Amino acid sequence: MRKIKIAFIGSGAMAAAMIVGLLREKLADPENLFASDPREDRGLELREKYGVKPFTDNLAAIADADMVVLSIKPQRLSGVLAELKGHIPEHALVLSIIAGATIKKISTGLAHGKIIRTMPNTPARIGEGITVWVASDAVTDEQKEDAQKILSALGEEVFVEDEGYLDMATALSGTGPAYVYMFMEAMIDAGVHMGFPRRISEKLVVQTMRGSVNFYEKNDVHVAALRNQVTSSGGTSAEALYYLEKAGVRTAISRAIWAAYQRSLELGREEKEHVPKDH
């Protein structure tokens, strides 16, 4: 990847994860990474840890940037877009990791056409995430390559042609860790209920999750086939799965993900209804 200057607007956990990944993979030099945050102490902390250049002024941070990463909370987006409008360098790529912020909203808000919208998930903070992303028509092939390499530093990445997939990704992978944690929590609590000390129950569940995923990835078979391998006729797995099916767990999971997808679509519609008009 060519060495480019990257300005982060907002320097929270996800921005820090991107900085760590970029430096770890030697995709950028510290002096070419600019971190803007209204909290001066946060910028100084990032400078001390990673050698990046801190800013409290967003316009100063983006002035010489080849890429601008929007990594702020959604409730701050409108104000930041208004502040940056007309000031993004013409050649620069804007990469957003803000949930629910559409390409149209960002492009209109900034008066800038080169936009990439992403949907990462929280494991990206440790380089184990999955990020789904889409690019506007104005983004060049070279900029797409830059984005792909940067997002790869957060874990896996999937490029899609249709922005509609971002709402689906929000419900499946973006919100997915919450489903996994809830299932883990239920299993851990069941272990404690049976009599295990909590620390042992946690270790058993965590390694079972980790090992099951790794085993699945190393075997080129359908996940249902692996489930059948551990489900002996009349055995404990068959009994447990019978109760899960009887309780409608499979249907509940499907409906929950569909509900999250519908909510993501609703938030997008609400966003369109509340886009402020220029005066």
Predicted regions span which residues?
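NAD(P)-dependent Rossmann-like dehydrogenase/reductase catalytic/cofactor-binding core
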Residues: 2, 206-279
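Residue-level recognition of specific faces of alpha-helices
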Residues: 150, 156, 168-171, 229, ...
